Regions:
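Extracytoplasmic
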Residues: 1-99, 123, 144, 167
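Active-site-proximal, structured, solvent-exposed surfaces of multi-pass membrane proteins
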Residues: 68-172
Length: 172
């Protein structure tokens, strides 16, 4: 039995099996590795808009960027301000946001002990987030063979700028 027993159904988890005394659940709201957003908030705006125990449910709705980089991200997506956000933290917003992210996610993702590769097709230029920890001098990235800056977003994940059309992304 788990601490979460009885709560999985409301979170989109479906019980599958028990093996070796472990309950196995399938998450119908999983996200593939690598996806883009249509809206962003700066770190300070995000912290003002949502109290600590609500923030986790909004991280699929907005990419969160350093305050000083707001102008850069504005060229790719819409900035949302705390008082203008109509999205309410909660389960329904989370589920809807996951479905939105799946519309702009990588079609392929492979990894090795040296890094990872991904492919994504975008209608317009955007930033693609990977839930991989950012390291200041750790990662290098290329998109379609051209070196790109590794961006730190959403409190410590990596992202990279991609163009419209097909993008072959490599992190090493």
């Amino acid at each position: 039995k788990t601490v979460y027993e009885g709560k999985h159904d409301t979170l989109g988890f479906t019980y599958v099996d028990t093996q070796n005394n472990y309950n196995i659940y399938e998450n119908e709201y999983f996200l593939p590795m690598g996806f883009a957003y249509t809206e962003f908030m700066t770190e300070s705006d995000f912290e003002r808009a949502y109290i600590t125990n609500q923030r986790h449910s909004m991280l699929c709705k907005y990419i969160v960027v350093p305050d000083e980089k707001a102008d850069y991200y504005s060229q790719f997506m819409t900035r949302v301000y705390p008082n203008a956000s109509k999205a309410r933290a909660g389960e329904e917003t989370y589920k809807a946001s996951v479905l939105e992210r799946r519309e702009m996610c990588c079609s392929e993702f492979d990894y090795s002990s040296y890094g990872f590769n991904a492919k994504i097709t975008l209608d317009k230029p955007n930033v693609v987030l990977f839930s991989v920890p950012y390291e200041a001098d750790g990662w290098t990235a290329t998109v379609n063979g051209t070196e790109r800056e590794v961006l730190r977003v959403t409190y410590g994940f990596v992202a990279v700028e991609c163009g419209a059309g097909e993008n072959d992304i490599e992190f090493s």
